Amino acid sequence: MQFPAFYVTGTDTGIGKTVASTALLHAVRARGHTAVGMKPVASGCVATPQGWHNEDALALQAASQPQPDYATLNPYALPAALAPELAAADVGVSLSLVPLQLAFAQLRAQAEVVVVEGVGGWAAPLSAQLDQADLVRALQLPVVLVVGVRLGCINHARLTAAAIAADGLRCIGWIANEIDPQMERIEDNIRMLGQRLAMPCWGRIPWRPNAQAEALAQHIRLPQ
């Protein structure tokens, strides 16, 4: 595949990065490649006999083939459903790039493609010292932007794309994820997004809240 690893970010929190990331994993696997997900930092985790686990990270693990060890897929699992900087401080954890780089290297050794899902929107910091751009640079990844299609999405998408470029990073594609079934003129909005975003569209995920990731993969258009 043209891009053996990439970082999935979004126009905001709650716009469907995990939906898109799991669909991407299944789309890559449908092409005959092995693919694993990674959630470097996750907040809002729940206690399990195996430790703190996050719903989104578990979804990535389930969509992966082979399925990696949870601690490798999600090195920083934070209990509080807060911004990572606050959630980490609550439990006395100091986020560092080194464990994330080591975990990523392990995942790269396990599969042909690694889909790395970020936190919140692009400008959401990882810690007082680290932005997501720092992590993406350290892992040397291109970026895929998930646009939550709702009122205001054109503004959010253009601002996010501009911020990624300003950070000196490459956005290789965007995905339209329909999150508001009541949105008016949705076709026009998606058309306008396509006209204003310089990178190619990797797909349009329809509003299907109970759909399985494997079914949504048919709406992904991976580059050759």
Swiss-Prot record:
Pathway: Cofactor biosynthesis; biotin biosynthesis; biotin from 7,8-diaminononanoate: step 1/2. CDD domains: DTBS. The active site is at residue 39. Its main location: cytoplasm. It catalyses: (7R,8S)-7,8-diammoniononanoate + CO2 + ATP = (4R,5S)-dethiobiotin + ADP + phosphate + 3 H(+). Keywords: ATP-binding, Biotin biosynthesis, Cytoplasm, Ligase, Magnesium, Metal-binding, Nucleotide-binding. GO terms for molecular function: ATP binding; dethiobiotin synthase activity; magnesium ion binding. ATP binds at residues 14-19, 56, 117-120, 177-178. Its cofactor is Mg(2+). It is found in: Cytoplasm. Substrate binds at residue 43. Homodimer. HAMAP family: BioD (MF_00336). Belongs to the dethiobiotin synthetase family. This is ATP-dependent dethiobiotin synthetase BioD. It comes from Xanthomonas campestris pv. campestris (strain ATCC 33913 / DSM 3586 / NCPPB 528 / LMG 568 / P 25).
